Amino acid sequence: MCRINGESTLSFLLKRKKDESTKILFATDMHGSEGTWRKFLNASAMLKVDVAICGGDLTGKMIVPVVEGKDGKFAYYLMGRTHTIDSSGLEKAFKDIRGIGYYPYSTNEGEYKEMTENPKKVDEVFHDVMTSTLSRWFDLIHEKIPSGTRVVVCPGNDDRLLVDKLIDEHKDVINGEGKVIDVDEGHEMVSCGWVNPSPWKTAREEEEDKLEARLEKYISQVKNVKTAIFNFHAPPFQTRLDEAPLLDKDLNPIIQGGSVVMIPVGSKAVRKMIEKYQPFLGLHGHIHEASGSMKIGRTHCVNPGSEYAEGIIRAFLIEFKGDKLTRLQRIEG
């Protein structure tokens, strides 16, 4: 069942007995990389998981205009240089652009000029392309995922607030944000895609005290926190799961002695919730470089990390039976 504010609203997970093993696949931070999303779905089907969970930051960050010129050629700028192709190269170009997490957009010289002069036009195009891409991605679930597997997506800090509505409207995917989901008869999952402040000033950031209040509100819906799964996009502060490069005022990594200086950037509120409630599992993401697993008290916490720009899926295959964790396996490919 799925509950919002403590009320049962939707039954979408197959009932499983307490003595049966439950298997989940957890990945995060795909950032518009179509290859990574497809691998996530394929791996979920191949591994026959009960629940496939995408922990946040599903959408891409920018569009790449593919501009048709008067000569019938197409030009686009990617990876530091301008590419010129004819119509026979469009399919490959679109695939390459999508593969690294950008959104290709076919346009003409007139519209492209308007986009360079009007930021509002760029935002409108981005909205339309992001919306159509997500809809197409979610349509793949029915094609690739067995009916016995359910897919849960929780928007992350880089996902615009309108993404929630797009997820809610699609019948094959469940929006985890702020909800309690019965993964099986003995384990509930509560999800939050909001994070503590970052230098990037993204859509779902808030101060630690506000994030703590939000998490407390979400957790209050859980019946048994000791067997719960906390699917919180922000990793807990000062753990191996939250180390990221220290940045200068221009947002460039600081290098000392030939090495990038790394600092903890996770959430103190998330760590406080884990230490206070000691849930069964903590599923985290947000910090791409900090993949790994660790325990905080009795709680097993993971961050798969992300290499979305390379089209690589990084995930954890997690299996448990009752209060016993029987598998915690890193998946990469």
Spans of features found by a protein language model:
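Core catalytic region of metal-dependent phosphoesterases/phosphodiesterases
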Residues: 2, 11, 36-184
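Binuclear metal-dependent phosphoesterase catalytic core
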Residues: 13-14, 32, 180-185, 202, ...
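Active-site-proximal beta-strand elements of phosphoester/diester hydrolases
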Residues: 21-31, 186-198, 229-233, 300-306, ...
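Divalent metal-coordination and catalytic microenvironments
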Residues: 29, 37, 52, 57, ...
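Active-site environment of divalent metal-dependent phosphoester hydrolases
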Residues: 31-35, 59-63, 154-164, 181, ...
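Catalytic phosphate/metal-binding cores of nucleic-acid and nucleotide-processing enzymes, i.e., regions
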Residues: 34-39, 47, 65, 254, ...
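Active-site-proximal segments of metal-dependent phosphoesterases and phosphodiesterases across multiple
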Residues: 119-131, 229-278
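Binuclear metal-dependent hydrolase catalytic cores centered on His/Asp/Glu-rich metal-binding motifs
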Residues: 185-228, 260-264
